[in-house]
């Protein structure tokens, strides 16, 4: 079985921070690629970062009608882009 090769790409995220501590990402800006509105946040959970093997918060989000993942680790946001 072939697996896609991916690389960690840090991104800028516009997010709303609520008084109860909840964070809702609204927009992802990928340098040299563009800006993408997040239509929906489906799930939030913890996962192991494949590159650093540290625990990161994983947001399952919908962008342009497709489900994808956005990660946050120690205040830095990233996506796993195809190489």
Q: What is the predicted role of each segment?
A:
Residues 1-83:
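Cysteine-centric segments in proteins
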């Amino acid at each position: 079985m072939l697996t896609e090769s991916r690389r960690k790409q840090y991104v800028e995220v516009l997010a709303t921070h609520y008084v109860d501590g909840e964070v809702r990402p609204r927009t992802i800006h990928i340098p040299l690629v563009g800006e993408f509105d997040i239509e929906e946040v489906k799930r939030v959970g913890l996962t192991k970062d494949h590159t650093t093997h540290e625990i990161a918060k994983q947001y399952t989000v919908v962008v342009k009608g497709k489900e994808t993942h956005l990660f946050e680790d120690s205040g830095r946001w990233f996506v796993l882009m195809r190489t």
